[in-house]
Regions:
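Nucleotide-activated chemistry modules centered on ATP-dependent adenylation/adenylyltransferase
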Residues: 1-5, 13-291
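Metallo-beta-lactamase
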Residues: 10
Length: 291
């Protein structure tokens, strides 16, 4: 198709919002998904629902990389940076000008300070990385391709609000990272155990009906005592923000504030609502675009 735009689609709420915003502006784009080691029926279904033309990149890892007994450290892999370089390659090969990502304002904030440095699990999704990457591409690869995030001005909670308008995706999407592990689950969209499940449940809760939310996750996570430690960390009452793609403490508190009546009887509300100390004015701040 003769358009100038590629858009990354991962199967999660953020990339779905990007696709729908582009469609609303009449921008014709081709969906791109990187499939690592195994077929992803989740992403295939989401792309089918978007009704976009698509390009699939198949990525295979050397099994030696996965060997836990190899004698070397297996640290964090900045996968968003790897995808950014793949994006540039795609644009050059297929003669596209723009590759659109879905990295949000919330990814600019770190998890913990260590020896005076802010450690950010999501640094390769941050605006700082995006600027460095754009300059590198322009100076050393090509000035004719531009990779950027459409959702950069938005906090996660604003993206969640936008996503909940697109009901047709509720049965198909997943932001649970266990779906994207090489040995990950295949039989369900949400593991119902991890920080990402807790965070997305919290973010969607102000904007969906109770039954819609429970249909997605299979249970009410606000009433599951096993989730209390996860919500404690996500809301900023634990030792550190989880090393997962979750938003800021403040926007998590804002989401809890917004469901104070809807989920009043839940364990999470009973444990944490009186501790959040947040005002209506501060809540409104998270729905405004940021510079």
């Amino acid at each position: 198709k003769n358009n100038k735009f590629f858009v990354a689609v991962s199967g999660g709420k953020d990339s779905i919002v990007t696709v729908e915003l582009l469609k609303e502006q009449g921008i014709d784009a081709t969906a791109v998904f990187t499939e690592t080691q195994k077929k992803s029926t989740l992403v295939d279904k989401v792309i089918e629902t978007t009704d976009l033309d698509s390009l699939k990149i198949k990525r295979y890892l050397d099994r030696k990389v996965l060997d836990k007994n190899a004698g070397y450290f297996q640290g964090h892999i900045p996968i968003s940076a790897i995808y950014a370089f793949l994006a540039i390659l795609c644009c050059v090969l297929y003669k596209k000008t723009y590759f659109i990502m879905s990295n949000e304002h919330s990814s600019n904030f770190g998890n913990i300070k260590y020896k005076g440095q802010v450690i950010n699990h999501q640094w390769s999704k941050s605006f700082e990385f995006e600027q460095i990457f754009q300059n590198y591409v322009k100076n050393f690869i090509t000035p004719d391709v531009y990779c950027f995030s459409l959702l950069r001005p938005f906090y996660e909670i604003r993206i969640a609000e936008l996503f909940c308008k697109y009901k047709k995706y509720l049965s198909y999407f997943s932001s649970c990272n266990r779906n994207f592990k090489i040995d990950g689950q295949q039989d369900k969209l949400w593991c119902g155990e991890c920080p990402k499940c807790a965070f997305v449940f919290l973010l969607l809760s102000p904007f969906l009906e109770k039954d819609e939310l429970i249909n997605i996750f299979g249970k009410n996570l606000f009433e599951d005592k096993n989730f209390l430690p996860l919500f404690k960390d996500i809301l900023g009452f634990g030792k550190l923000k989880p090393f997962d793609c979750v938003g800021t403490f403040e926007e998590s508190k804002a989401a809890l504030y917004l469901v104070r009546d809807k989920f009043r009887a839940g364990l999470v509300l009973r444990d944490f609502y009186l501790k959040i100390k947040i005002t209506e004015m501060l809540v409104e701040r998270f729905f405004k675009p940021r510079n």
